Amino acid sequence: AGSSDAIKIGMSGPLTGGAAVYGTAVQAGMEIAVEEVNAKGGLQFELKCQDDEHDTEKAANAYNALKGKGMQIMAGPVTTAPCNVVAAECANDKIFMLTPSGSGASIIEYGDNIFQICFTDPNQGVASADYMATHDLGSTIGVIYDSSDVYSSGIYEKFAAEAQAKGLNISCVEAFPADNKSDLTTQVTKCKD
């Protein structure tokens, strides 16, 4: 709907780049939802999307572009690092923000107008350790995680703490940087030894 009475929703997320699978899925879902709601008549919505490429600076630019187009509701960003930047702006500008998939625990701390739909990183780490302990999935655990990624590191930290509390033995922890995601042979070999 292009009506001036339509509620303007801004969405930002990675629509290109390595994390695009997340952003494009959210964009497609939002486009379908807006189309279905608008087809029923009554309250109308207008959706504008911006690519943040999972980059904090580009997320800030996307937010400002959407705000400049009259955005009233922020749907996104989609990933945690951009969410932290945009949440601070939304809190300051008093714009309602709802992230469908930003999972960092700090996101909602920016203001009472910032909301998350999905589970947080700490919850994922704790739940994983609890599941492994409850289902007796192994007495010795190796952990391999992306040390350059807030999401991966956040899950690892909470997993390690909960695993220790549950008496699980983490015998190997190997991290890899962002530039080495395609070959984890070294990390797997170290954990196997």
Where are these regions (language model features)?
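Short beta-strand segments enriched in small/hydrophobic residues
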Residues: 5-27, 77-78, 140-146
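Immediate post-signal peptide segment of exported/extracytoplasmic ligand-binding proteins
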Residues: 1-13, 39-44, 133-140
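Short hydrophobic/charged patches on amphipathic alpha-helices used for structural packing
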Residues: 60-63, 129, 185-189
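Beta-alpha junction/loop-to-helix N-cap segments that form part of ligand/metal-binding clefts
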Residues: 21-28, 36-109, 117, 177-182
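An alpha-beta-alpha
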Residues: 15, 114-179
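Short, high-confidence coil segments that cap the C-terminus of an alpha-helix
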Residues: 70-71, 137-138, 193
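Non-catalytic positions within long, well-ordered alpha-helices that form the structural scaffold/packing
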Residues: 60, 67, 133-134, 192
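Conserved hydrophobic residues forming the short capping helix/wall of the S-adenosyl-L-methionine
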Residues: 34-38, 160-163
